[in-house]
């Protein structure tokens, strides 16, 4: 399960369904979940291509990469993709992918996220940056945060883990080094927040997270976009293409502008951290 990605999918289906209904048309969705497996992404994309669908929505970086590599004649909209230039290997990315690809980005304001570390853990002299090395978007976010911290005179060190096998050991290293820990928007982290929490909470090390789903599992606070709204935005782009003949090659990547400061009440209490009044409590989702 990956709550953020599921929210984006639901937003997409709701928005496109509504736009189609308004136009007196119906839309059929073929929902396939690759569970973050690259080989499954490739297989699913192959099936979509063979069925000659009108549009492919690719949720998350691995899905977008698989679709963009295999399909050139069907419009592809990405969502929950952090940095399209990094994901698709485009040098000097200017905001528009071109060809048959566009979509929405879940990139948060990284400077503001970095500043949160300094605001909430003012005594922090060293910050550990924990992320999955298999995700290029995570590396991008971590470098930006490190740059900001360095300019503020705060030391940081990267703690990349390869997969779930070494996550616990690497998280332990991060918790031993850092006065605080930053984890970016990262699919592997999102699926393994319990492991990270089990290591870091007993050591009383606060984690600032790139998005709400991760923060709800192991963080103290986040500046998070709404993945549902990101999906809605993607669905509206799909409607422009399918109903109004918009040219996807000219559509710039869109960003969500509804980011909110949120906090995990349980972990903040456990670590004795008080957040400013403008922070909104993360509601635990019913299992």
What does each of the following model-derived ranges do?
Residues 9, 13, 41-45, 53, ...:
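Extracytoplasmic/secreted envelope proteins and their assembly/folding machinery
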Residues 136-211:
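Pocket-lining segment of extracytoplasmic ligand-binding domains
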Residues 240-287:
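Hinge/cleft segment of the Venus flytrap/periplasmic-binding protein
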Residues 34-91, 186-210:
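Beta-alpha junction/loop-to-helix N-cap segments that form part of ligand/metal-binding clefts
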Residues 26-50, 160-175:
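Structural motif
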Residues 1-14, 30-39, 188:
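Extracytoplasmic "Venus flytrap"
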Residues 84-126, 225-246:
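Hydrophobic alpha-helical segments within soluble ligand-binding/sensing domains
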Residues 12, 102-150, 247, 251-267:
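An alpha-beta-alpha
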């Amino acid at each position: 399960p990956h709550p953020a990605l599921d929210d984006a999918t639901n937003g997409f289906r709701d928005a496109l369904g509504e736009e189609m209904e308004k136009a007196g048309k119906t839309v059929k969705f073929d929902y396939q979940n690759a569970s973050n497996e690259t080989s499954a992404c490739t297989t699913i994309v192959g099936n979509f291509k063979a069925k000659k669908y009108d549009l492919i929505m690719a949720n998350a970086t691995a899905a977008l990469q698989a679709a963009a590599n295999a399909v050139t004649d069907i419009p592809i909209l990405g969502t929950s993709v952090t940095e399209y230039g990094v994901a698709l290997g485009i040098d000097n990315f200017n905001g528009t992918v071109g060809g048959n690809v566009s979509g929405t980005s879940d990139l948060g304001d990284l400077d503001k996220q970095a500043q949160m570390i300094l605001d909430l853990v003012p005594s922090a002299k060293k910050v550990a940056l924990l992320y999955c090395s298999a995700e290029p978007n995570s590396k991008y976010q971590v470098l930006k945060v490190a740059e900001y911290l360095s300019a503020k005179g705060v030391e940081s060190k990267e703690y990349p883990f390869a997969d779930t096998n070494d996550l616990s050991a690497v998280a332990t290293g991060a918790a031993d080094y850092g006065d605080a820990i930053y984890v970016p928007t990262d699919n592997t982290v999102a699926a393994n927040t319990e492991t990270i929490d089990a290591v870091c909470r007993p050591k009383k090390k606060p984690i600032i997270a790139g998005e709400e789903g991760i923060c709800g599992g192991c963080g103290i606070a986040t500046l998070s976009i709404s993945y549902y709204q990101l999906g809605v935005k993607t669905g509206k782009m799909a409607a422009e293409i399918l109903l109004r003949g918009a040219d996807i090659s000219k559509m710039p990547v869109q960003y969500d502008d509804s980011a909110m400061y949120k906090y995990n009440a349980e972990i903040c209490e456990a670590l004795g951290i008080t957040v400013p009044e403008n922070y909104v409590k993360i509601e635990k989702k019913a299992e």
